[in-house]
Amino acid sequence: MAGRVIIIGAGLAGLTAAVAARTEGAEVLIVDRGPIGLGTNSALANGVMSGPSDRYGAEDYIRDTLRAGCGLNCAARVRLTAREAPSAFRVLRSVGIPMRERGAQRTVVSPDPSVIPGVTLMRRLSDHVRGLDGVHALPGFCVTELLRRDGRACGIRGFTRRGEPLQIEAPAVILAAGGAGALWRRHDNQRRIMGQGYALAAQAGLELLDMEFVQFYPLVLAEPGLPALIVYPPFAREARLTGASGEDILAKHGLADVNDAIVKKRDRFSALLFEEAQAGGVFLDLRGVPAAAWDAHPLAIFRRLRFPFRERPAAVAPAAHFMMGGVRAAETGETDLAGLFACGEILWGLQGANRLGGNALTECVVSGALAGRFAAERALAMPPAPSCGQKAQPAARAEGAGTAVQYREILRGLREAA
């Protein structure tokens, strides 16, 4: 098990961690309950990443992040992200991710505007990871517990998609399992995102911070029969938000720039639209949008849906979107449990009470790169240790653990690399 890093979660944070860990020379195994890459929330993202640039300084980014988070952010984490973001963005470009920089944001560009940018991002990154020797993936694997020995993480236990119990040992484990949005009846997350990483962390004795801060996205389709798809910015100038009686909601509340409200005031904008929805409904009216706009992102995505958007308004409402709270970790990504690292949405500190638009993916690439690098250093520096076996201290006892399938047998049978 020496030199091995296990990554729980195959979204942007997990795959970024895999690239970093492999670059340092570690053997990497990625496990996920769903498909690698495209089965994660990262694939549903608009592909926007906030961060410092030549025209948007680090202090500007820090100010906007703290302001959006109502000052409840971990200031050290915000400064760390500002410092590390530019290099993390360069890594994405180096592996073939098409990105456009404009002011405070980098945006992933899909060659086909009807394809969600997150899909393009995760396809390209998954393809890159798939080509790395020493990186393996186990999709359809459900982790049920973290193994511990002598006060440090030493592996995982769980079940394969065929229901086989499996114990895998490693001197470094990275939690990159995402948030818990699918716990809400109305959400825009993948259905599997139900807080498994938080549960594993809590069972291992880690403190979860600020879990009361849940971000709702303001504009999500609410038409019966349609998926709960985000209405991605930029918001078309000719589009209108109306109430049940046809009144202009934006004018009613003095919102001159809806895109600014989506990015910087998402919490208050969602609360406002929720109240309007309770009073009779909120509708997105795209009938005045020019035909040419339907050939460009983001409206080109709507062409795939069976709804007459050009003929009548569509119901929209806020939906659970992102968890601001999570696990505390050092700058290296290591948690209070030695050998256990965390990255992505499960990590506490950057967002405060409300996330700045574009900071989700930024958090993934920055914290993923750091966790992967330092987890690899930890794994490579550790001498061979006795098996976790019966001496391990699992956070929760799993039935059938004694009949665990050997890791090497499973690895030889893998047909899908991340």
Predicted features along the sequence, with ranges:
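Glycine- and aromatic-enriched mobile tails/lids
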Residues: 1-3, 20, 24, 35-37, ...
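N-terminal Rossmann-like FAD-binding beta1-loop-alpha1 element of flavoenzymes
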Residues: 4-30
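Residue-level detector of alpha-helix initiation sites
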Residues: 11-12, 35, 180-181
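Conserved N-terminal glycine-rich FAD pyrophosphate-binding loop of Rossmann-like flavoproteins
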Residues: 34-66, 70, 231
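Conserved redox-cofactor binding core of oxidoreductases
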Residues: 38, 88-165, 169-172, 176-177, ...
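A glycine-rich dinucleotide-binding beta-alpha-beta segment and adjacent secondary-structure elements
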Residues: 138-139, 144-153, 159, 297-349
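Glycine-rich loop(s) and the adjacent beta-strand/alpha-helix scaffold that form part
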Residues: 172-225, 361-374
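An anion/pyrophosphate-binding glycine-rich loop and adjacent beta-alpha core
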Residues: 200, 206-308, 312, 374, ...
